[in-house]
Amino acid sequence: MRIFGYARVSTSQQSLDIQIRAVKDAGVKANRIFTDKASGSSTDREGLDLLRMKVEEGDVILVKKLDRLGRDTADMIQLIKEFDAQGVAVRFIDDGISTDGDMGQMVVTILSAVAQAERRRILERTNEGRQEAKLKGIKFGRRRTVDRNVVLTLHQKGTGATEIAHQLSIARSTVYKILEDERAS
């Protein structure tokens, strides 16, 4: 029996360190830890794919938390079934559960459904917060790009930089930068 570890974060801004430390503390060797920095909504993850190829019957995979293996109930169940068919057990350190046996798989299925429901609630609250912010005039996303040709046309007509900035709702420094870039080219 070999013990492997798996860790995943959803974004590149998040850190894998805590999860890696947890599986190491549970006895997993560093060269047997597989990681991904990707959304759990997709099961096509490089680290997970390598782990799938590496494990054999009798092996155990340790994951810090249930939602680190997958975020969607169907995908989670599919992964657990796949590992089970290979004779590989998955154990979730923080949750204290394992896919060994029928009871373990039932608990995992229930917990993954609960985790999915919690994510939906979080998404609902996030969307409600965004809608409230929009009503208050808070804008989201990247600022719109400036049409350089409009700036240049207004300048050629004799409009000053301050007035151009005011008309286009952009910073005066942006107007100067566009004019400077035009002179340099």
UniProtKB/Swiss-Prot annotation:
UniProt-recorded name of the protein: Transposon Tn1331 resolvase
One annotated GO molecular function: DNA binding
Family from the record: Belongs to the site-specific recombinase resolvase family.
Chain residues forming the annotated DNA-binding region: 161-180
UniProt-listed GO biological process terms: DNA integration
Domain of life: Bacteria
Keyword set, alphabetical order: DNA integration, DNA recombination, DNA-binding, Plasmid, Transposable element
Domain Resolvase/invertase-type recombinase catalytic: start-end pairs: 2-137
Role of this protein: Resolvase catalyzes the resolution (a site-specific recombination) of the cointegrated replicon to yield the final transposition products.
Gene3D superfamilies per UniProt: 6.10.250.10, Homeodomain-like, Resolvase, N-terminal catalytic domain
Active site location: S10 (o-(5'-phospho-dna)-serine intermediate)
Pfam hit, one: Resolvase
Signal peptide: none
